[in-house]
Amino acid sequence: MDEKPGFMLIRTKSIAVKKPYIQVNPPLMTIYFVFDDDKENSALSWFDANLPAPLWTTQNADNGHCHHCYKLEIPLCTSEFASIKAIKYAQAVYYAYALKLGADLSYSQLITKNPLHPQWRTTYWT
């Protein structure tokens, strides 16, 4: 997503890392589970839900809304050559975490708040 809301542009990595929103997962691969938590002051929702600490949480300082990012131990292939069982298992885990967090179930995970951008309050938990 560029500075103007409503559209996304593919950028080189050197440019993308300077933007407020980034795509953390490459096409056809899931390395990170990202959860959109739109409750006020939701930085510790994972703790309140008795979930493991995410790798990082990026928080909007104005309203407290957060993105929680968990790095998978083993990246998940999502191409046509992937294991359907592995994909379904990962979806079940993601859904269970989203329910416990009270996260937005319609969030696509395509882009997330860039943890390196000064617009967000970022906490690295692990």
What are the functions of these language-model segments?
Residues 1, 6-13, 19, 38, ...:
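Catalytic "initiation/cleavage/transfer" segments centered on a nucleophilic residue
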